[in-house]
């Protein structure tokens, strides 16, 4: 309860406090509930739709924490829906990957007007800032878990430069901007890149890990050793973050039109997302178990386990994937950091002849802390 007191005290209005508290089941119903519920429903409507970029996984846990573990699943569509506390507002979380034909959320957001928010990596937002502009409103993850991995018994790689020297195929999803960055640094050869990756372990397994493949540090190392029996041994990896490439991964973003229309909604919703991530990190098991159930019910190639998801959460914390910013706030944006990424990517896009990005883009155009509650963050030695 002390966490609740710490952040709720800074929120104006007892009705809004009731929304946040009841929304997470921290307190039972009070006389303020009806007012609080009508505030969120009045601002957001009866449903909030979020398009994710992959199968349900612990990196997406803030959303599932917010939707609760008693929701319903449309396994054919990959949509999970749960009510935000007792507010009468449903949160519909849509899986990505094969459920969207491997289209990225940013494309879906411009094709489907029912989508409120989507996961839009900051580098992708920069790349499409002219053609498909978006504004990020909260970042549950501080740094990306993105990795390149391989079988250390097959490839002698210890640093990024070794990837280029190895001559091995580098299997990645199409459209990943970070791979272009590694090419410009001279660490990966363009001829090595294969952008036909679809998330399946088949090619990595069939080559016995003699290729370099993208993944998450919080997922694939465990899965390939323990869940994917055809492989069943450790992988070695390098985190893309360690290359100096540090955009925000999977922040929740809106189109400018939705942002303008939903400001009142986002003012209430964003602190809920922040608090959901804090709550999940302190007690991850219920959501982790639910994620396993959802993925099992989806009946696709993606696999999760209770032990793997528990490991994932610990790795998120150990590797600093989830952490407060330079302050004691979780989910906010550092504009200086983001402007550095913009400046880094502009010459890459110019060299490729892209006309999809805004050449005059500033960090303030693509992210905002306007809805962030600065009092919500993880407890650390620095942040009590």
Segments and roles (model prediction):
Residues 1-15:
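N-terminal export and membrane-targeting signals
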Residues 19-41:
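C-terminal region of N-terminal signal peptides and the immediate post-cleavage residues
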Residues 35-197, 204, 211:
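Short, glycine-/small- and polar/acidic-enriched structural segments
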Residues 71-88, 167, 238-245, 260, ...:
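Short, solvent-exposed loop/beta-turn-alpha elements that line the ligand-binding surface or hinge
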Residues 123, 197-203, 208-300:
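Pocket-lining segment of extracytoplasmic ligand-binding domains
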Residues 142-148, 248-252, 257, 341:
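Small-molecule pocket liners
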Residues 262-352:
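Secondary-structure end/capping motifs
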Residues 335-384:
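Conserved C-terminal helix/tail region of periplasmic/extracytoplasmic solute-binding proteins
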């Amino acid at each position: 309860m002390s966490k609740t007191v710490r952040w709720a005290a800074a929120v104006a209005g007892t009705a809004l406090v009731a929304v946040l508290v009841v929304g997470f089941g921290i307190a039972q119903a009070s006389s303020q509930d009806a007012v609080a519920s009508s505030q969120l429903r009045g601002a957001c409507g009866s449903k909030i739709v979020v398009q994710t970029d992959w199968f349900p996984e612990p990196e997406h846990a803030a959303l599932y924490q917010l939707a609760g573990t008693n929701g319903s699943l449309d396994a054919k569509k990959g949509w999970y829906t749960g009510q935000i506390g007792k507010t009468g507002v449903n949160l519909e979380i849509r899986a990505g990957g094969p459920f969207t034909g491997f289209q990225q959320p940013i494309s879906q957001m411009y094709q489907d007007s029912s989508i409120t928010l989507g996961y839009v990596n900051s580098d992708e937002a920069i790349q499409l800032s002219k053609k498909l502009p978006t504004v990020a409103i909260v970042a549950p993850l501080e740094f990306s878990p993105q990795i390149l991995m391989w079988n250390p018994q097959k490839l002698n790689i210890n640093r990024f430069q070794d990837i280029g020297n190895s001559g091995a195929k580098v299997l990645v999803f199409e459209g990943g901007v970070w791979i272009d960055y590694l090419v410009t640094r001279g660490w990966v050869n363009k001829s090595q890149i294969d952008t036909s990756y679809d998330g399946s372990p088949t090619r990595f397994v069939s080559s016995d890990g003699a290729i370099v493949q993208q993944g998450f540090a919080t997922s694939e190392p465990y899965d390939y050793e323990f869940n994917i029996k055809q492989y069943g041994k450790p992988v070695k990896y390098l985190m893309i973050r360690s290359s100096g490439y540090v955009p925000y991964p999977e922040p929740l973003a809106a189109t400018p039109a939705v942002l303008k229309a939903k400001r009142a909604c986002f003012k209430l919703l964003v602190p809920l997302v922040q608090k959901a991530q804090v709550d999940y990190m302190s007690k991850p098991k219920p959501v982790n178990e639910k994620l396993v159930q959802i993925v099992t019910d989806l009946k696709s190639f993606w696999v999760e386990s209770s032990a793997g998801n528990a490991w994932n959460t610990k790795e998120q914390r150990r590797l600093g994937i989830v952490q407060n910013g330079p302050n004691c706030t979780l989910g906010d944006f550092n504009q200086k950091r983001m402007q550095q990424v913009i400046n880094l990517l502009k010459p890459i896009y110019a060299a490729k002849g892209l006309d999809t990005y805004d050449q005059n883009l500033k960090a303030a155009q693509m992210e905002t802390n306007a809805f962030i509650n600065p009092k919500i963050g993880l407890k650390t030695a620095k942040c009590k």
